[in-house]
């Protein structure tokens, strides 16, 4: 079990992270895990990626965004801009060599934003990305899955108080701030094509009420490239955390890292 260590170099929040698996010196393609909104790196899927890394002796990095898990900061201070900057920072500072990025829910959106940023600003880092696995990607969630879905009461509460307390089917209610929604406007990407030269795998449950199948199809349609697939998991909800679903996620990730390593089947 990896110990939690902290990165204080950003100067904004102390970010908790864990490194699992083997050493980069082995030359195997590693993993970079991005969790979801209000999720911790020690959740079921984050642990599954760590287990896969250990079993295959490859390096895996996972971390908590500020206001999440073991990281410092208030959740209500978070924005997509802030969490994106933290994600890019962790990728550049704590990974080397080839990586497959695995993003769940909001982490899927952040994965696409990282790719877009590096493609434009850091081609050498972009070339290290060997593939994406997007699990129920909540692309443009602040607009499509939050604001556009809110009724007049929710919008009035946001206007009057600057926040809306949203019930959660997974635990305590969470606070959605007007600041988060406004900031999200800077990062909307669904309306313009994004070309990716590496394999992309989207995994989506058919019974997901948080990120519906229709939204996953929007992400799929927005992406262009030689090897992009969308797989529907019948009966799967947003968590995709049953043993069979976790095994499917691990097998999907393993397929991409093996391909990047030049392993033939």
Predicted regions: what is each one?
Residues 37-50, 214-215:
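The serine-hydrolase catalytic nucleophile loop
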Residues 89-153:
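Primarily recognizes the serine-hydrolase "nucleophile elbow" in alpha/beta-hydrolase
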Residues 125-233, 237-265:
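The alpha/beta-hydrolase serine catalytic core
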Residues 68-95:
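Catalytic nucleophile-loop/oxyanion-hole region of alpha/beta-hydrolase
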Residues 50-72:
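Conserved alpha/beta-hydrolase
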Residues 38, 65-69, 139, 237:
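Alpha/beta-hydrolase active-site loop signature
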Residues 1-24:
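N-terminal cap/lid segment of alpha/beta-hydrolase-fold proteins
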Residues 27-36:
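Short beta-strand element of the alpha/beta-hydrolase
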């Amino acid at each position: 079990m990896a110990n939690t260590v902290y990165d204080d170099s950003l100067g904004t929040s102390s970010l908790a992270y864990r490194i699992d698996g083997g050493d980069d010196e082995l030359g195997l393609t590693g993993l970079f895990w991005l969790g979801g909104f209000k999720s911790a790196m020690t959740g079921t899927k984050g642990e599954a990626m760590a287990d896969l890394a250990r079993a295959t002796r490859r390096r895996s990095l996972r971390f908590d965004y500020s206001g999440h898990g073991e990281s410092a900061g208030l959740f209500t201070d978070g924005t997509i801009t802030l969490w994106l900057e933290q994600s890019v920072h962790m990728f550049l500072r704590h990974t080397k060599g080839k990586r497959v990025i695995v993003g769940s829910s909001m982490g899927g959106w952040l994965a696409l934003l990282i790719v877009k940023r590096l493609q434009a600003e850091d081609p050498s880092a972009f070339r290290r990305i060997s593939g994406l696995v997007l699990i129920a990607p909540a692309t443009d969630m602040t607009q499509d899955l939050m604001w556009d879905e809110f009724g007049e009461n929710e919008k009035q509460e946001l206007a009057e108080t600057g926040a809306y307390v949203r019930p959660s089917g997974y635990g305590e209610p969470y606070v959605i701030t007007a600041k988060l929604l406004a900031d999200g406007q800077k990062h909307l990407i669904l309306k313009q094509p994004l070309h990716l030269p590496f394999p992309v795998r989207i995994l989506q449950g058919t019974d997901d009420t948080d990120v519906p199948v229709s939204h996953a199809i929007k992400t799929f349609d927005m992406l262009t490239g030689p090897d992009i697939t969308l797989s529907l998991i019948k009966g799967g909800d947003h968590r995709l955390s049953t043993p069979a679903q976790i095994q499917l996620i691990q097998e999907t990730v393993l397929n991409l890292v093996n391909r990047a390593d030049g392993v033939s089947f």
